[in-house]
Structures are given as structure tokens and as C-alpha cells.
Design a protein with these regions (language model features):
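Class I S-adenosyl-L-methionine-dependent methyltransferase catalytic core
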Residues: 1-287
Length: 287
């Protein structure tokens, strides 16, 4: 087992694991930025690369680079079996603060999003939120969908699941994205998500249903009335508390590469206190 932590917490983690499992030496804690230490960790696990592997990616904010997720996906690819299963936590407050109505908070936040997604394919979503086309909920759904789309279509995962966790006030706290090639893993996670007292993002579920309906209409040559998508999405929203797997839909392609940062303070994303409560972050996304 490989664990990743910053230097201070890393030492405490070593102490806790050693106390809990004094006779077990099958673990190692790697200090520092996981984006930099992952290659060393994977090299240390080379002898067990044949084994099914699970990675829990739990960042504070939006620090994990797409190159890190890609490295995990590639690690067992030549084994012609399943890739590393990834369970990735996407913090909703982080998305709300960096990607809210006021837009990306300066050039450094834009660069952090480039690193998070591995490209600037997030730009149409930012533009939609900026011009009022997307609500805060729709923005979150689109960003999570983009991440899932890339996991399946860029990295080749067969299935992804997305589950939104909310607090007692009903405000989003984070979304858990699970990516797998394993039918048993798919079945187990689908069952766990369905059994949890949680819900899939209603906005995402509805948009996926409408996107599939659009594809069927396009294949049949049927015309659609302009401006009706949001009405269809509202009508398609499911019952809160239920989980139904929906595949990601094709994200909006980048057409206009202009990034409007007028009036935006150039805030370093590492200076944002991500542990503020979700309700405050949600308010930021609506302002």
C-alpha cells in the first residue's frame, strides 16, 4: 500500500499506521506533492503490478493534475487486464469558489484548471456560467461530466459513476467519481451508490437523459425547437435520494478560446481555504 501526504501529516500518518498494524510492513508513506512522488511510488510497487489495484484520490481543493490520473490509468495498461480503479473526490466547494459566477479567479486559477483537466476543454462551461446560460447546479454537473467523459473517452475506462454527497442542509460537499474496467467493480460500486443515503447529481442525470434524447432525434432527422433544452432538463430531473447510473454526455466543444478575466483578482488557488462550509461556497457560486 502506498500513501501520500505532506511532510507534517506524513509523519503522523506513519505513526498511526505503525501503531494500528505493528506487524504489517506492506505499506509506505510518500511525503510531498503526490503529483511529483507518484512515479517513485509506482516504481516501488512494480513487483505487484500484476494485481488488481485501487487508488483513492482525495485532494484538498483542485491540486491533483490530470497527468497523475493518467499515470495511474497507464500503470497496468500493458497487462491487458483492468486498469487501476480510481475513486476520485471532486470537492464541490472548490469548484464553486474557483468556477463561480464571477468566473475564474485570475490567471493562476485558470492554469490550475488546465492542470486539473489536462486541457482547456473546461472553457465553454466557464463561459456558460459567466454569460448566465448555466446555473450554479448546471455548472457543477457539466464539470463533473467533463471529468467523467475524459476518464472514459481519453483514458479508456469502461464505466464511471458519479455520486454527490450533501450536508444536512442539502448543500453539495463533494462528488465521488469512480472509474473502472472491472464488471465486478462496476456492480459493487453501483450497489453501494444505490444503497447509500445520498443522491446522484439530479442536474447531471437530467442532462444525460436529454442528451441521449437529442442523439436519437438527430439520428431520426427530427428538428427541435430552439431554447427548449432547459425546460426539458427540468422536466427530466429525478427524485432526490435515488441513484441511477447515467453515462456522461459529449461536452460542449471549445469554439471561442477567449478567456474573460476582466475584473478578476489573480488569486493563488492554494491561498483559498477549501474547508469553509459548503453553504458559503454555494453562495459564492450564485453571486
Amino acid at each position: 500500500m502506498a500513501f501520500f501526504e505532506l511532510p507534517g501529516p506524513a509523519q503522523r500518518l506513519r505513526t498511526d499506521i505503525a501503531a494500528a498494524r505493528p506487524n504489517d510492513q506492506r505499506w509506505q508513506v510518500f511525503e510531498g506533492d503526490c503529483n511529483q512522488s507518484l512515479p517513485t511510488a509506482l516504481a516501488s510497487l512494480e513487483e505487484v503490478r500484476w494485481a488488481p489495484t485501487f487508488a483513492f484520490v482525495d485532494p484538498r481543493g483542485v491540486q491533483v493534475a490530470w497527468t497523475t490520473v493518467t499515470a495511474l490509468a497507464d500503470w497496468r495498461r500493458d497487462k491487458k487486464k483492468t486498469k487501476v480503479e480510481q475513486w476520485i473526490l471532486m470537492p464541490e466547494p472548490a469548484l464553486a469558489r474557483v468556477l463561480g459566477l464571477r468566473g475564474v479567479h485570475g490567471r493562476r486559477s485558470a492554469e490550475r484548471l488546465d492542470r486539473l483537466f489536462g486541457s482547456r476543454d473546461w472553457l465553454p462551461i466557464h463561459q456558460g456560467r459567466r454569460n448566465g446560460t448555466l446555473t450554479a447546479d448546471a455548472m457543477r454537473a457539466e464539470f463533473v461530466n467533463l471529468y467523467r467523459w475524459q476518464l472514459e473517452n481519453h483514458l479508456g475506462y469502461q464505466t464511471t459513476h458519479a455520486l454527490q454527497i450533501v450536508n444536512t442542509a442539502g448543500h453539495p460537499v463533494y462528488t465521488l467519481i469512480f472509474a473502472t474496467d472491472s464488471p465486478p467493480g462496476d456492480a459493487i460500486m453501483g450497489h453501494l451508490y444505490g444503497s447509500a443515503v445520498t443522491s446522484m447529481i439530479p442536474e447531471m442525470q437530467a442532462r444525460a437523459q436529454v442528451a441521449r434524447q437529442h442523439r436519437r432525434e438527430d439520428e431520426s432527422g427530427l428538428a427541435r425547437l430552439p431554447g427548449m433544452d432547459e425546460f426539458a432538463i427540468e422536466a427530466a430531473k429525478g427524485t432526490p435520494g435515488s441513484y441511477q447510473h447515467q453515462p456522461p454526455w459529449r461536452p460542449t466543444p471549445v469554439v471561442d478560446e477567449a478567456l474573460d478575466l476582466e475584473g478578476e483578482p489573480d488569486i493563488d488557488p492554494d491561498d483559498i481555504y477549501w474547508d469553509d462550509d459548503a453553504e458559503a461556497a454555494d453562495d459564492d457560486s450564485r453571486s
